Design a protein with these regions (language model features):
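Glycine-rich, flexible loop segments associated with nucleotide phosphate handling
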Residues: 9-16, 173-177, 197-201, 217-218
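Charged, low-complexity helical/coil segments in non-catalytic cytosolic or luminal regions
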Residues: 105-199
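A short, surface-exposed beta-strand/turn
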Residues: 90-126, 211-235
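Preferential activation on post-signal-peptide N-terminal prodomains/segments
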Residues: 1-105, 131
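C-terminal structured domain segments
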Residues: 189-195, 202-214
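Generic short beta-strand segments
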Residues: 81-89, 184-186, 206-210
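Conserved histidines in hydrophobic membrane contexts and catalytic metal-binding motifs
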Residues: 24, 115, 203-205, 228
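A general secondary-structure signal for short beta-strands and their flanking turns/coil
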Residues: 74-76, 108-110, 198-202, 216
Length: 235
């Protein structure tokens, strides 16, 4: 019932997602921020101070979502931007990878900007992972053949399955299906510069784990498109 109330509130948005996107992009332009591309957008509800216990007023991603006063909430769109190279955006969130010998955890998260737009205008702005581009290490690098990337992914899925400790007598068959694959950019530790990061092309895979057709969870893997190394989460 409460979820339906939130959906009805969000259905009252008076502008299109594209119109909101143009407003968010105008904010970036006005601030002189370039080199960012849209990676995600979603409907949400913004609450003013005192209308929701969550500090940022978004009412997202926690139990505080259900404590907001919808009579005071404003529906809108939340836009997430990240570093973009020739139209290809970066991974906005850290992704957990199995700890293997060729796993490289970036020293800090990918730079992202989140902007919430309502009918009253901008209600939320957050800039995470602010960074400075020092130099370009190399250009026009050759990517690893996709067949080798697939082999790396298969290894990672096997490591995950092996970690479950399923006994030899257990006949339960776990299924792993790749439901999404996308080429993006992300950070990896810079060679001999542990406090710096390289922005590198990477394959982002979403793998669905299921039993007998019943989905259990979705797993995310990030594999460096240049050398096949596994990239872990920035903590």
């Amino acid at each position: 019932e409460l979820a339906d109330a939130y959906r009805k509130c969000m259905d009252k948005i008076t502008f299109t997602e594209e119109d909101g996107k143009e407003q968010a992009e105008q904010v970036l332009e006005d601030l002189g921020i370039d080199g960012m591309g849209l990676v995600d957008s979603d409907r949400t509800v913004w609450f003013p101070n005192g209308a929701c216990s969550e500090r940022n007023g978004l009412g997202l991603g926690s139990d505080a979502l259900w404590q907001g006063d919808l009579d005071r909430g404003l529906p809108g769109y939340l836009y997430c931007f990240s570093k973009s190279v020739e139209g290809i955006t970066s991974v906005p969130d850290g992704v957990v990878a199995e700890e293997t010998v060729d796993s490289y955890v970036p020293p800090f998260q990918v730079e992202t900007i989140s902007i919430l737009i309502t009918e009253e205008g901008i209600k939320y702005f957050k800039w995470d992972g602010i960074s400075e581009e020092v130099c370009t290490v190399t250009e026009n690098t050759k990517l690893l053949p996709f067949e080798k990337i697939q082999a790396k992914l298969t290894d990672q899925i096997f490591y995950w399955y092996s970690g479950k400790g399923q006994s030899a007598n257990d006949t339960t068959a776990l299924e792993y299906d790749v439901v999404n694959a996308k080429l993006q950019y992300t950070y990896t530790t810079a060679y001999q510069e542990p406090k710096h990061a390289w922005l590198v092309p990477a394959w982002i895979f979403t793998v669905r784990e299921s039993i007998g057709g019943n989905s259990l969870q979705e797993l995310s893997y990030v594999i460096n498109a240049y050398d096949g190394s596994v990239i872990g989460e920035a903590y």
